[in-house]
Amino acid sequence: VEEQHSYIETAKDKGYKVLLLDSPIIAHLIQKLEGDKEKIAFSRVDGDAVENLIKKEEATVSKLSDDEKDALKPLIEAVVPGDKYTIQMEAMDSGNLPFVITQPEFMRRMKEMQQTGGGMMGSFPEMFTLIVNTNHELVGQILNTKTTKKRERLIQQSLDLARLSQNLLKGEALTTFIKRSVELIK
């Protein structure tokens, strides 16, 4: 629960009810319920951007134009490791975080089943989706920053904050993040 605290609070702020399903066999139960009842679907609070957990007709308008998004994506791809992250540009609430890391529901469920004895998939690679909030002020700042060094620092800091929120920042990467953060507040 503590690892997903920010995601839980964001979902509650949107008016969603959040269930705590933390039993080792819950993945099998969810699969059974979703298979038997076609109108039931479970989503993790950290499985996607909160705007996408429950599909709605209303679309959030992006502050960035399509051309600006097309210009921004390669700038982010140049800094973010492509072997671990798929980058997705989305118009979310401007109060949400600039970068959000999610793991596709299917990949996570397969991994959990493997851990509880399924074992059929071998070792699943860690793949994540990096959702870039095109309505966040910092993302606009990244796009409009003139110097490459500053832009890369903003992207790396935002990525590391997103990784930290998912407990993915460890070892040398964590040490580098802490040192960079100290430099930023000096």
Q: Model-found features: residue ranges?
A:
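Long, intrinsically disordered, charge-dense linkers/tails
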Residues: 1-186
